[in-house]
Amino acid sequence: MEQKKRSSFSSRIGFVLAAAGSAVGLGNLWRFPYLAARYGGGIFLLVYLILALTFGFSLMITEIAIGRKTRLSCIGAYKALDKRFGFLGWLAAFVPFIITPYYCVIGGWVMKYLFTFISGNALEAADNGGFFSNFIGYDAGSLSSTIFSLNGPTPWFILFVLATTIVVIFGVEKGIEKASRIMMPILAILAVVIAIYSLTIPGAMQGLKYYILPDFSQFSVSTVLGAMGQMFYSMSLAMGIMITYGSYMQKENLLEHSVTQIEIFDTLFAFVAGLMIIPAVIAFNGGDPSQVNSGPGLMFITLPMVFDSMKFGTIIGAVFFLLVLFAALTSSISLMETLVSVLMDKAHMKRKTATIAITASCLIIGMLSCLGYGPWATITIIGMQFLDFFDFISNSVLMPIVALLTCILIGHVVGTKVIADEVKEGAGSFHREKLHRVMVRWVAPVMLAAILASELATKVFHLFTI
């Protein structure tokens, strides 16, 4: 009965756009350009492309096939494959439970910056970090005044959560698929427009050469680990999203072809994000690629200053933050949908009830990250603010563990033939079956263990050196 009642995307392109929208997020915009600049530009791009076509493809098609085969959310899907791995479904579901609240907080920051640029106050945002620090660290003296002030992050966080909720509550076809069909083409067009404009800035060609041309002398193990980590996080793997979206995929759709389209879109967007950002930032900093920083510092401090130095910078900045808003929304929608799907499957809730429940929990938990740089800044967990801690636990610990255990389950317990048979059901063939078998059984587990060890070693080293 569950399979008959389960919602589905109306077409393959609807599924591809929704899944690509999940993959295309803030990581593409603020982490990929930084890593490309740090690890030699062109050589990083080359390594990233190779890994996306092998490592990323194998993990993504595995998760989507699991979802389509079982027609269940991640908790039920893993248990359906092997009852001993039922715990893995809960672990996978816990990842978006942690990520969704703080991701919506950052989405609220984006809304604030978009409003700032649209209202003609872009100069305020270009003050080398002062505007950003005052905004996320806003403290009006009393908690109620801080929460309800537009000068602080909380109202913007709430607004972003509600925007995400509205899409999810309408369901798969009328909500997620329809929103993806609108936002993804606009996202692509805006990215190309900004990239083209960025390349017209005086001095941008030097940054373009650094970004495009491979320098093999800069190739190292760190380059591979950096590209592997970015590709892993970028593709929305190991958080139940692709399993959930796979469960909405129609059986007659070509699974391998769809995954190829998703990875092409995600990789192209990451590449264009680099074109938007790296040449402009390098030109702004007099040709120094080391000044391309990562995370919020790049998006909310460096780029507003770059826009301020441009002709028509206010307009370009507004267009950029609109692009970022769409990218953040398509990702937050997939995160929330994963949790809603779990409640619908396990607690037998109706979509509306499940969405309201997840929204409420998101607002409550997200308040920790929202106020973690302001009134609650003195409260830390192992030396980290709430948002940084949630990001570390989800991205650096849980996601590699979930992906590693998934590879063990598929590669050494139930067998890769389970995935291959599901892929062939819609197409009759699986062109990269041998690659998939080798990657999932042997190569991917080693890579994932390396990512986990690298992240933990970096954090432990940091803790003992502060």
Predicted feature residues:
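Transmembrane alpha-helical segments of multi-pass small-molecule transport proteins
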Residues: 14-15, 19-20, 49, 90-93, ...
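Extracellular loop-to-transmembrane helix junctions
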Residues: 36-62, 88, 152, 398-400
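Membrane-interface "cap" regions at the ends of multi-pass membrane proteins
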Residues: 1-30, 59-64, 68-80, 84-90, ...
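Inter-helical loop and helix-membrane interface segments of multi-pass membrane transporters/permeases
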Residues: 3-6, 34-39, 69-91, 105-169, ...
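Transmembrane helix-boundary motif of multi-pass solute transporters/channels
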Residues: 11-51, 246, 257-260, 264-267, ...
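Membrane-embedded translocation segments of transport machinery
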Residues: 2-9, 13, 177, 181-329, ...
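Loop-to-transmembrane helix boundary motifs in multi-pass membrane proteins
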Residues: 8, 14, 154, 265-271, ...
